[in-house]
């Protein structure tokens, strides 16, 4: 436990890749836990210049919410990191951490698409199937983009960063449109291969018989 707490206070490794966003993590190997990743919750936007890593506690802390969402999505067959633990400290403003199993030698889909587009397009088939499972269960991943998709060394495809995910009461077609729109914006903004967007749109519409 002491070793894990020390990781909470260790300098985090900022995401250096395209679409890495504000995510900062610490990777380590701890006896009894194995290879893990500690996610340090940090703010984005202008507010980060004033309050970078503290949140006002209103309801569940972010780390607990994401932990529970990961349990849920994995339970319906979505490939997401295995949650191990969560922690937060302070009130009414708190810092938060989430501990998950490490995905070995990961590469984001955004990175892959820039160095091996054919492989990235092949991976998109698995991404579409994962998103389809989310839609089937009315789960909307608000911030899903190619930087939040990891490919492990064994070829496994994982969706990350569910801290802003939510159950959506709308019908599946409306949720589908939200996913397509969010994904397209990210691909366009960061000048990733356009086929990433086209394959997401075509794959989801085909799965739901939408023209």
Name what the model sees in each region:
Residues 3-106, 132, 136:
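Conserved ATP-binding subdomain of kinase catalytic cores across diverse folds
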Residues 38, 142, 160:
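Active-site flanking residues adjacent to catalytic metal/cofactor-binding acidic residues
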Residues 104, 146, 164:
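Short, glycine/acidic-enriched loop or turn micro-motifs at the edges of active sites
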Residues 108-117:
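AlphaC helix of the protein kinase catalytic domain
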Residues 119-130:
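Conserved alphaE helix
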Residues 137, 142-144:
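Residue immediately N-terminal to the catalytic "proton-acceptor" Asp
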Residues 144-151:
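Hydrophobic residue at the +6 position relative to the catalytic HRD Asp in the kinase catalytic loop
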Residues 152, 157-211:
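C-lobe/activation-segment region of protein kinase-like
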């Amino acid at each position: 436990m002491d070793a894990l707490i020390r990781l909470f206070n260790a300098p985090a490794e900022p995401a250096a890749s395209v679409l890495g966003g504000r995510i900062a993590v610490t990777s380590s190997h701890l006896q009894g836990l194995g290879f893990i990743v500690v996610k340090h919750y940090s703010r984005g936007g202008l507010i980060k210049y004033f309050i970078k890593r503290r949140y006002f506690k209103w309801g569940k802390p972010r780390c607990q919410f994401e932990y529970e969402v990961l349990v849920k999505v994995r339970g319906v067959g979505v490939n997401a990191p295995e949650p191990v633990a969560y922690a937060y400290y302070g009130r009414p403003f708190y810092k938060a951490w989430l501990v998950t199993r490490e995905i070995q030698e990961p590469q984001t889909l955004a990175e892959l698409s820039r160095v091996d587009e054919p492989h990235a397009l092949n991976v998109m088939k698995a991404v579409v199937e994962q998103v389809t499972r989310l839609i089937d269960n009315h789960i909307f991943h608000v911030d899903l983009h190619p930087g939040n998709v990891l490919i492990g060394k064994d070829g496994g495809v994982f969706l990350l960063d569910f801290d802003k995910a939510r159950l959506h009461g709308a019908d599946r077609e409306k949720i589908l449109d939200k996913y397509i729109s969010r994904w397209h914006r990210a691909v366009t903004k960061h000048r990733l291969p356009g086929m990433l967007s086209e394959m997401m749109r075509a794959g989801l519409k085909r799965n739901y018989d939408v023209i």
